[in-house]
Amino acid sequence: MKSTVEQAMLFEEKSIFENQAIEQGYSQVAGVDEAGRGPLAGPVVAGACILPRGKVFLGIDDSKKLTPKQRRYLYELLLEDPEVDCGVGVISVERIDEINILEATKEAMVQAIASLRSTPDFLLVDGLFLPHKIPSLKIIKGDARSVSIAAASIIAKEYRDELMRKLHVEYPEYGFDKHKGYGTAAHLQALKHFGPCVYHRKSFSPVKESIQEGVCQ
């Protein structure tokens, strides 16, 4: 585990894009990221986050690099801090099937930005170009390179995981609480046995195949 000093240095290193935007005259820089592009079931969720200038949040990192316990701690820390501005966007399975996952991801991001308390004047977006009236910068692997995007990734991931745990209560046979809708061996086996439920993405290959095979809830 990294020391407090090491974590503070890492936070500063990953603030380079935010600092550059501030130097260019922007004041409200929001990181934007998504969770749930790849799963076979459940919505796609986006997070947006504006971190207060001059405040260090130790441990902030790409949500995929954190343990569930670390991620939950940071999620609650971000939500409970009145100086942190967080937003979430959720796009349904029906909408994903209607317009495709990439466009649905962009819609979720736009929703997340709109749900912030304040209006950002610059966006740092993980991995894709986001058509928006607010100026933006696409950062490849941004969740590992920008603290604002990393914070947004934590918010999106934790929020979506909570949604998937709720779907598990409704459809426990699929194990949504464990794999969160991703195509694990156990999920594929359940899909083969039970067929898709209303929360499965019918435009995704394994789900589409099970429908063609006539396996339905």
Curated annotation (Swiss-Prot):
Catalysis: reaction(s): Endonucleolytic cleavage to 5'-phosphomonoester
CC cofactor: Mn(2+); Mg(2+)
GO molecular function list: manganese ion binding; RNA binding; RNA-DNA hybrid ribonuclease activity
Domain named RNase H type-2: residues: 27-216
Positions of transmembrane segments: none
Tree of life domain: Bacteria
Pfam families according to UniProt: RNase_HII (PF01351)
GO biological process: DNA replication, removal of RNA primer; mismatch repair
EC number(s) reported in the record: 3.1.26.4
Subcellular location: Cytoplasm
Main location: cytoplasm
Annotated binding of a divalent metal cation, by residue: 33-34, 126
Function recorded in the entry: Endonuclease that specifically degrades the RNA of RNA-DNA hybrids.
InterPro entries tied to this protein: RNase_HII, RNase_HII/HIII, RNase_HII/HIII_dom, RNaseH-like_sf, RNaseH_sf
UniProt name for this protein: Ribonuclease HII
Cellular component terms per the entry's GO annotation: cytoplasm; ribonuclease H2 complex
UniProt cross-references to NCBIfam families, sorted A to Z: PRK00015.1-1 (NF000594), PRK00015.1-3 (NF000595)
Homology family: Belongs to the RNase HII family.
Cofactor note: Manganese or magnesium. Binds 1 divalent metal ion per monomer in the absence of substrate. May bind a second metal ion after substrate binding.
Enzyme class: hydrolase
This protein's UniProt keywords: Cytoplasm, Endonuclease, Hydrolase, Manganese, Metal-binding, Nuclease
Ranges in coiled-coil conformation: none
